[in-house]
Amino acid sequence: MWGEKMDPLSGFISSLIWWLLFFYLIMAPQIQYKQLQLARLKILRELSNKRNSTVITMIHRQESIGLFGIPVYKFITIEDSEEILRAIRAAPKDKPIDLIIHTPGGLVLAATQIAKALKAHPAETRVIVPHYAMSGGTLIALAADKIIMDENAVLGPVDPQLGQYPAPSIVKAVEQKGADKADDQTLILADIAKKAINQVQNFVYNLLKDKYGEEKAKELSKILTEGRWTHDYPITVEEAKELGLDVDTNVPEEVYTLMELYKQPVRQRGTVEFMPYPVKQENGAK
């Protein structure tokens, strides 16, 4: 009856269930994330033991969804460079470093810091690219003794960007139009653009000259910074080899397993699905 009082025990159980549900909703994501971190560390430990190296990762997933469903895009930041510099500094000097990179690029300052620290490491350094390392990611890869890429992975040009425009395009626009016809702001941008190109070009040259020799280092540094391609142009394994870069395609299987642990948490039906094993058809066809 509506007028009857609820049994105290029933009320307690109902309240307890609601509190447990509330606690679960709060704690479940944190527990899952902790489990994910432990799974990643397990693979990194296995890879480190297998290759007898210090394994460092810089993985920027682009599909992360932020508050209210707004995409959150990750790039190379100063915080990244600080963390990686600490990791390199802590690594044994006589032990190789494997740096796994998955990034669209980011701050030139941060990328140059990482590249410089990687090049200075006394033991062999290897950059592993399972999918892509564009812009600043390529700059870091050039600092390594060996670049290891998946057969379908790509690098990219390292020409500096000023706002939304490539520095080489700004310089070219002023040259074509004529300095006397350009406004003061454009001339200032062109001056900054020239300096930015020279700075990155010289940095790439210094990264490469010990390994490739002065002439080849000059050639590569010019090709990668002169604006020959758009900034998002994908430099494939084949093209990297044609340019003269020393590229290997033997990516350890553990790296692919690791990348699986960086997937976006499922919030809706995925847009890509596949069968990860051979399926036998009814008519006997393969």
From Swiss-Prot:
Transmembrane feature ranges: 8-28
Q: What is its main location?
A: membrane
Q: Short name of one Pfam family for this protein? A: SDH_protease
Q: Provide the alphabetized UniProt keywords.
A: Membrane, Transmembrane, Transmembrane helix
- Which InterPro entries does its entry note? ClpP/crotonase-like_dom_sf, Pept_S49_ser-pept_pro
What top-level branch of life does the organism fall under? Answer: Archaea
Show the GO cellular component annotation of the record.
membrane
Question: Where in the cell is the protein located?
Answer: Membrane
Q: How does the record say this protein sits in the membrane?
A: Single-pass membrane protein
Sorted alphabetically, which PANTHER family does this protein's record hold?
A: PERIPLASMIC SERINE PROTEASE
State the family it belongs to: To M.jannaschii MJ1495.
The protein in question is named: Uncharacterized protein MJ0137
